[in-house]
Design a protein with these regions (language model features):
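Short His-centered aromatic/hydrophobic patch
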Residues: 82-88, 106
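Conserved donor-binding/catalytic core segment of Leloir-type glycosyltransferases
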Residues: 4, 170-200, 211-212
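Acidic anion/phosphate-binding donor-loop and adjacent secondary structure
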Residues: 139, 146, 154-170, 186-190
Length: 620
């Protein structure tokens, strides 16, 4: 895929660091990446183009739109990823009526406007760096959260993987080194001012506390008059509080380890915690206090103090700051707890997983931009010669199945498999050749009558289907439900499974022995089931297994992430999921097909409006 990162930088910010980090990983993955911005203040390996993205001139904005439209056409750009309000607005107009998708990352509060309420300028999907940003967008703009993903800033944890606890132990706040890292502009300027003023008011509590300003200066924070007064105050208290200024272009674990505690938010808070340094979360909106192993998720929701839907400026209570400093002092004597926090942060913010999620979101956005309708995904099980006893009605007789195929043919449907969808989604096949009326036929379990009855009929009518097969090749029948409410039904087993290779079916995974995802003791066991079944089937059939079907349609919170982590590209449910296929490709809605389907029921279940109708009726 060809990607453009669109920024409006006039100085270095976290958004540019974030964009260059994404670009570097995407280049490693073989993507072609461009970076467009007013200026460049962080090294980038993407192809850079200067463009006045941030402009107050309407004429310049219109010129930018036409220039960018020409650029995406000339370079065959699949996705524009915007990283600022100005970039999102430009990206929106530049991609109108094109095949290029648009995704925006929102790092903080968005100012309300009538135009944003009337139509979504942020693209097919919005990435928010924390839950509070997502809440503000949904509340103030009325956006549907189905197209918003909370994905944290990726961090190269390898820079911080040499965790070593501080050897020196402090017994009080004497000789304590505290750092405030980050720029001193906007609300963060006020944050820094509040901390310094609080420490001055409480200087009698210290003997030798050293405050390091990293990336900012006192002159950035205070007026000339207040700066003179401040320096006089510092001279009067002598060694109780010392303030130093330092410029570090790129912070690493070795920097953080020289400080006893760090005050920061966003990326700074994450990096400090990863380094094993006591971290006090204080950002543009909130003083969250000391980061502990119990409040990581809570603090992540505000991006460690940077965002609250209803708070616009930071405030600080002296006692809260002193309590956090004392907690940091105690933490210095508990390096094991710092290590636990570092490991938890590593799990959440590790860059590899986040880069993979964003890349997959690009693909979903590209697919949604080019085909935004619901694609019917029908679910079959058994295709017996004649009627059978089945309490769950999970069969269609061979004669009726042929009627279904005749109906699909007469309605002009073209069947697709998930591997074919993948080729369109990743830009390997142009959407110019995408079928006008796509249809996905799926079969579960691997019954013999699928091979004997369904496959020949599918071939006869020029159709193909997806078979979700159990990885245990020794299973000979439906042991999970036979004897109670379903008759025993033969499953293709042993060496006969090789016959699937020449059938009308593409293989997907249905687990190993038909256990529901909720049957496993913990997440690791469930993940192993998905990975192991995938590996077995790939070894057996000799091609990548791209899709997974949750047994019984049973899922649990995080099931979609499990399928993603296991390496699948799609996962299907039974009667719940996204309103479109790529809204959540790991929770795909399937339509149950029953023995008594007729022309009108099939017409309803394959109509483009059916999924939304089902959702409004069943609320799932």
């Amino acid at each position: 895929m060809n990607i453009v990162h669109l920024l409006s930088q006039n100085h270095l910010t976290g958004a540019e660091v974030y964009a260059t980090s994404l670009a570097e990983k995407q280049l490693q993955d073989g993507l072609k990446v461009y970076q467009l911005s007013n200026g460049f203040f962080a090294p980038t390996k993407a192809v850079p183009f200067k463009l006045e993205v941030e402009t107050k001139s309407k004429i310049q904005f219109i010129k930018n739109v036409f220039w960018l439209r020409n650029f995406i056409s000339k370079e065959s750009i699949h996705v524009i990823h915007s990283h600022s309000r100005a970039a999102s607005k430009l990206g929106f107009y530049a991609t109108l009526f094109t095949r290029t998708a648009h995704v925006s990352t929102v790092h903080g509060r968005q100012h309300p406007s009538i135009s944003k309420k009337l139509f979504n300028q942020y693209g097919q999907f919005i990435i928010t760096v924390c839950e509070n940003v997502k809440k503000q967008i949904c509340r103030d703009f009325g956006y549907d959260d189905r197209n918003i993903r909370t994905i944290p800033n990726p961090i190269d944890v390898e820079i911080f993987n040499d965790y070593k606890p501080h050897l020196e132990r402090k017994t009080d706040l004497n000789d304590f080194v505290l750092a405030i890292a980050g720029r001193a502009t906007g609300p963060k300027k006020e944050r820094t001012r509040l901390v310094i003023e609080s420490l001055l008011r409480n200087s009698s509590r210290f003997k030798n506390l050293k405050l390091i300003l990293v990336g900012s200066k006192l002159s950035d924070v205070f007026s000339d008059q207040r700066l003179i007064e401040l320096k006089l105050s510092l001279n009067q208290i002598q060694t109780a509080l010392q303030i130093q200024e330092t410029e570090i272009s790129e912070l690493t674990g070795s920097h953080y380890k020289t400080w006893d505690a760090v005050i920061g938010s966003g990326r700074v808070a994450m990096e400090a915690a990863l380094s094993g340094t006591a971290t006090i979360a204080f950002g543009e909106a909130l003083f969250e206090g000391l980061l502990t192993q119990d409040n990581v998720d809570q603090l992540f929701s505000s991006n460690f103090g940077d965002m609250h839907p209803d708070i616009f400026e930071p405030a600080l209570n002296d006692e809260h700051l002193l309590k956090a400093l004392e907690g940091a002092l105690l933490r210095k004597n508990k390096p094991a707890e710092n290590k636990i926090i570092a490991e938890k942060m590593r799990e959440i913010f590790g860059s590899q997983q986040i880069h993979s999620r964003i890349k997959r979101l690009y693909e979903s956005a590209y697919f949604q931009k080019n085909y935004s309708c619901w694609i019917p995904v029908l679910m079959y099980h058994k295709i017996p010669d004649q009627e059978i006893q089945s309490q769950h009605k999970i069969y269609v007789t061979k004669p009726n199945f042929e009627k279904h195929l005749k109906f699909f043919k007469s309605r002009g449907f073209t069947t697709l498999t998930f591997s074919e969808l993948s080729l369109f989604r990743t830009g390997k096949i142009s959407f110019n050749s995408f079928p006008k009326k796509p249809l996905i036929l799926t079969f579960d379990d691997g019954y013999k009558d699928n091979l004997v009855n369904a496959s020949p009929l599918l071939k006869q009518y020029g159709f193909k289907a997806q078979l979700f097969l159990l990885a245990d090749s020794q299973l000979q029948s439906n042991t999970w439900d036979s004897g109670e409410d379903e008759p025993t039904h033969e499953i293709v087993s042993g060496d006969d499974r090789a016959l699937w290779k020449s059938s009308a079916f593409e293989i997907g995974s249905h687990g190993i022995r038909h256990l529901p995802i909720t049957a496993f003791a913990n997440r690791d066991h469930a993940l192993n089931e998905l990975i192991e079944s995938k590996n077995r089937l790939e070894k057996e059939f000799g091609y990548p297994i791209k899709s997974f079907a949750f047994t019984y349609g049973i899922t649990s919170p995080g099931s979609d992430q499990l399928a993603f982590d296991a390496g699948y590209e799609y996962a299907v449910n039974t009667d719940s999921g996204g309103l479109t296929l790529e809204e959540n490709p790991y929770s795909i809605f399937r339509v149950n097909i029953f023995p008594d389907e007729n022309y009108w029921s099939l017409l309803k279940k394959t109509s483009s409006w059916y999924r939304r109708y089902f959702y409004l009726k069943r609320k799932k």
